[in-house]
Amino acid sequence: MTTCPFVAKAALYMERTADWTPVSPLTTVGMWHQALGEISEDVVRLDGLDKDHLRVVYARRFERHLVSVVTNATCFLRDLGVEDPAAAFVAEWERAAIKHPGMTLDCDGPTDEVRFYALAEEVGEVAASLTYDNANSTGHNADTIAEVTQVGALALAWLVRYQGGNERSEDR
């Protein structure tokens, strides 16, 4: 089995957010949607940029939005009673690596567009888990902790591709 590429980053973000006050689920999901809008814009712009100095600027901006998603997922999980969000993110990546070999968001398989859709879908699942009828026959029956964990793990996996404003692969 492949080793999770973001163990150290997950621990770093957990440490950095240790004393943060959690915000409401509404605020978190809203911030994620804002970040998704910025990420989609960055993906489009990065795809059309030929100048290296501009690519670095947008890659760093892109990285900041992914960090925002991760740190908010970390705080949300803590507020939901998860003691070690970093371990939860790593365990989720390990499950995904088995279920989707070569297609976790750190791999070269998916494009940034596909990565975006995967992250957006999971943010939507978190929102679905918070609806009034989630646990009813008319709802999605989504587990909020599991869905928030997937959001954080996906963002971390994608984030390892953008270290210091540089893409790990030209296969976007």
Task: Identify the function of each model-found stretch.
Residues M1-R172:
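Flexible "arm" and connector segments at domain edges
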